[in-house]
Swiss-Prot record:
Protein name as catalogued: Increased recombination centers protein 22-1
Compositionally biased residues, Low complexity: 201-213
Assigned keywords, A-Z: Endoplasmic reticulum, Membrane, Signal, Transmembrane, Transmembrane helix
N-terminal signal peptide: 1-19
Transmembrane segments annotated in the record for this chain: 162-182
Family assignment from sequence similarity: Belongs to the IRC22 family.
Topology term for the membrane: Single-pass type I membrane protein
Organism: Candida albicans (strain SC5314 / ATCC MYA-2876)
Function: Is probably involved in a pathway contributing to genomic integrity.
Residues in compartment: Cytoplasmic: 183-239
Amino acid sequence: MKLSTIFTAFAATIATVAGYETTGSKQTVDILIDYIIKETPELSQNDVANWENGDTVTLQYVVNNNEESEITVVGVTGQFKNPVNNEIVTNLTTGKVGPIAVPPGEAIKFDQKINVDLIPANYELIPYVFIAQDSLIKVIPCRGQLATIVDAAVSFFDPRLIFLELVLLITFAGLIYVGYEIWGKQYFKGVAPVKAKKVSAAKASSPVASGPSTTSATGYDTNWIPESHLKQKKTKKVN
């Protein structure tokens, strides 16, 4: 079975889409375009994709040319719409493709990367493919894809969060230091108790002489020795 036949069967749910020429007139073209989301290929148009801000979503397109003449894929764009009121929320940046020529009865693939950065809400993504045929550029809309977009959860070990924590910690420590230097020192000086000077035990126990002191030949003061004791010593020396 030819590869183009497989892709045609895969896109059988997509009817022949309406192409819009740059002249503003409307016509029907026999070009089938479908895509899958490479990160979640199991999702269909009836499912809701879940994306986080900061994600990069890759759409892989399959273009089947059922026209009688050759077509050329030259670009891709798209829109995020409000699925409730169908209002356009934002347009995707137009990306250049190829150009890639697609002969009659053949099919080609190409990718489009989309950076998700929207207010958390529900959206419908509708891509558009630019096709050149017979000197005209035709814009062919693809099927819509419902998606729920949320903000990415911030990890405690995220380098940006760690840096912010360090900045806050250093700032807080700096404020405490400045506050202590300006007010803290003066406050603690005013409330701190005054320490009494300690007197050594040796100085406290030593007697203070009230009169003149005499020193004996032995080298010590004899004023405090009882007189009877001194007489006994002299008597012993005479004997």
